Design a protein with these regions (language model features):
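A glycine-rich dinucleotide-binding beta-alpha-beta segment and adjacent secondary-structure elements
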Residues: 180-194, 362-366, 424-488
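C-terminal segments that line or cap access tunnels to active or ligand-binding sites in enzymes
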Residues: 329-439
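N-terminal glycine-rich phosphate/pyrophosphate-binding loop and immediately adjacent elements
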Residues: 2-136
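Ferredoxin-reductase
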Residues: 537-615
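Helical element adjacent to the flavin cofactor pocket in flavoenzyme catalytic cores
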Residues: 207-271
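Short beta-strand to alpha-helix junction loop
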Residues: 62, 159-172, 214-233, 243-245, ...
Length: 615
């Protein structure tokens, strides 16, 4: 029996699981519906190139910061962070005649704003103070969920006394504080970082993003796809595991307490089973947990009715359309900095932005260069534009590749429009494009299970904070939430929420125990040293086997036939897939062509020139 079951393997879920395993020695089972762990931190590959689905840049990763300590602990120090250029973001507002590079210093940022808008000098200084105060207010909210219960009342009192403008709508704050519409537009250019347009978002969401990048931005060397596999090592060290292709159907309740989950195993023919544990932690979002995984009637439904009503009242957040490009080369001037371009002159309206995007005339886009940030040799680009998920409802329930000609025409129009818009900000981009792939809210829904494909879970409106929904606690004993709906969105926001959840699970001593572990962590051994060891080994948790390459031969110029010997392996069947470690923290799924005796036979496509193509 496991000590805890975690539903989902996003960064919040993995943080909670990793801390419970590392700090308390807990045996944790993580259940992931897909064949790759990591949620929105996972990466995907095409022809050797890779794109990071949800991690585009991370702030507050300087040595000694709390997020840096947390990630160092979870990954055993194996994760290296590349610092982005000092001007990590470039804001382009053609309608206001502005192109501004954001510096990696809050003080320099304030001076820059004053130099551009000297007539707003006093208001800018007040704005910078308000941003820091709102940031401190949200930090206190995190602390309220981490500290022992006896300290919580004092923190909640401080929160009530120091709310200030934190729960004011961002657009209302900007209109009240600044006269110049160009300055208001510039300051809110990057609202896509928290997913709710200024007319709806709480000012604290804006403030958290501004302060998050106060000291610059970082990106994981090698890309974000390795993060989940690094944290997995800590989970496995105490007998836990990440189990893939597992659909959690229900959370099991006994006498008002969560006692386990009902799961469908889809690794081969679907099989239903139950797993029991005294602690159940959901990392798939509050809406999904309360409306799908838990009963909505009977005693449990009565306990959760108030929360479900509050969630329904909030409505949905925004989603996004992303165009993934490979280039022959990077255009002149591209250095890895992000580019935000917005052609609108008035306040951003997500409904109008969505209509324009679907017509192939997008107003705004976020442009990222993951290959440069990760230190990859391939030239890759991501162009993201935010959209209402309702625009894609007619294709809800359809499968990728089977959505019809109308969908193909729509995605082609959106891709052309976004590439054209990006080319205006980065001349020469269009001519360098080699391949194009498009993801819509339907893609996000498929990978996150968020209703409608909402990128950031519950929208960061004043109503969300007033309803006190951003918490790991639930009305059900033994059940906790983790991830962005238990705190704030983004990689660090979700990870800190995961830390809050671990503190709750561990009880009054949880916070000091975790802080002691982060402070006292010691360097770990190099994980790459044993990556080519061929001795047979079965490690903790799910079965892992060391295989010997028995035969490797070419079937065609692009396909290699590889037979692996696994003397202690259980019976495999043709048609199943195996995850094969092709490099440290790099696992690839391969379909089994056959599995005679103690061997398995794989057919490997080598066209990608990836790590698995070099056997």
């Amino acid at each position: 029996m496991y000590d805890a079951i975690v539903i989902g393997s996003g960064i919040g879920a993995l943080t909670t699981a990793g801390l419970l395993a590392g700090v308390a020695g807990a045996r944790v089972l993580v259940l992931e519906k897909h064949s790759t762990p990591g949620g929105l931190t996972h990466a995907f590959r095409r022809m050797g190139a890779s794109w990071d689905v949800g991690l585009h840049y991370v702030g507050d990763m300087h040595q000694g910061s709390r997020p840096r300590q947390l990630f160092d602990y979870l990954t055993g120090g194996a994760l290296t962070w590349n610092r982005m250029p000092s001007g990590y973001d470039r804001f382009i507002r053609p309608g206001h005649g502005l192109t501004v590079t954001i510096p990696s210093s809050f003080k320099e940022y304030q001076h820059l704003l004053i130099s551009l808008f000297p007539h707003e000098k006093r208001a800018i200084r007040r704005y910078c103070r308000d941003v820091k105060r709102a940031y401190s207010w949200m930090s206190l909210r995190y602390m309220a969920d981490m500290v022992p219960p006896q300290a919580s009342p004092a923190i909640h009192l401080a929160l009530r006394l120091r709310t200030g403008c934190a729960l004011e709508r961002t657009e209302h704050y900007m209109e009240r504080r600044f006269r110049d519409p160009a300055l208001r537009a510039l300051l809110t250019t990057h609202w896509g970082d928290y997913g709710v347009e200024p007319a709806r978002s709480a000012f604290v969401a804006h403030a958290m993003i501004v302060c998050h990048y106060m000291n610059g931005a970082w990106f994981p060397r090698g890309g974000s796809g390795q993060i989940a596999r690094m944290i997995e090592e800590r989970i496995r060290a105490t007998g836990g595991e990440i189990r893939l292709c597992q659909d959690v159907d229900d959370i099991l309740i006994d006498n008002g307490r969560a006692v386990g989950v009902r799961v469908t195993d889809r690794r081969s023919a679907p099989v239903s089973y139950e797993e029991r544990a005294p602690i159940v932690i959901s990392g798939v979002g509050a809406r999904e947990t309360y409306t799908r995984l838990l009963p909505t009637t009977g005693p449990v439904g009565a306990l959760t009715a108030r929360v479900r009503d509050r969630i329904a009242h909030l409505g949905h957040g925004g989603s996004a359309v992303t165009v993934y490009l490979t280039l022959d080369h990077y255009p002149t001037g591209v250095d890895g900095s992000n580019v935000w371009v917005n052609t609108s002159q008035g306040p951003d309206n997500l409904e109008q932005m969505t209509e324009d995007l679907c017509r192939g005339r997008p107003q705004s886009a976020f442009i990222s260069f993951p290959g440069i940030k990760a230190g990859d040799l391939h030239a890759t680009v991501e162009i993201v534009s935010f959209a209402q998920p309702q625009a894609f409802d007619r294709w809800s329930g359809t499968r990728p590749g089977m959505r019809g000609e109308d969908y193909e025409r729509l995605t082609s129009a959106m891709a052309r429009g976004l590439i054209d818009l990006a080319d205006k900000a980065i001349p020469g981009l269009t001519d360098a494009v080699r391949s194009v792939e498009v993801a819509t809210p339907l893609t996000i829904k498929h990978f996150t299970s968020h209703e409608g494909g909402c990128f950031y879970g519950l929208p960061l409106t004043p109503e969300r904070f007033a309803a006190d929904l951003a918490s790991p606690s639930t009305p059900i004993d033994g059940l906790y939430l983790t991830g962005q709906d238990a705190g704030m969105p983004g990689i660090v926001g979700a990870a800190l929420a995961g830390m809050s959840t671990a503190c709750k699970v561990l009880g009054p001593a949880g916070y000091p125990r975790i802080m002691r572990a982060l402070r006292d962590q010691v360097p770990t051994q190099d994980h790459a040293s044993s990556s080519h060891d061929t001795t047979t080994e079965r490690t903790a948790g799910a079965a892992r086997h060391r295989a010997t390459v028995q035969r490797a031969r070419w079937m065609s110029p692009t396909t290699r036939d590889i037979t692996l010997e696994l003397p202690e392996c259980a019976t495999w069947e043709a048609g199943q897939y195996a995850l094969v470690r092709v490099a440290p923290f790099e696992w690839r799924p391969y379909s089994l062509a056959s599995a005679p005796g103690s061997t398995v036979r794989l057919l490997v496509d080598v066209r990608t020139k990836g790590m698995g193509a070099s056997w």
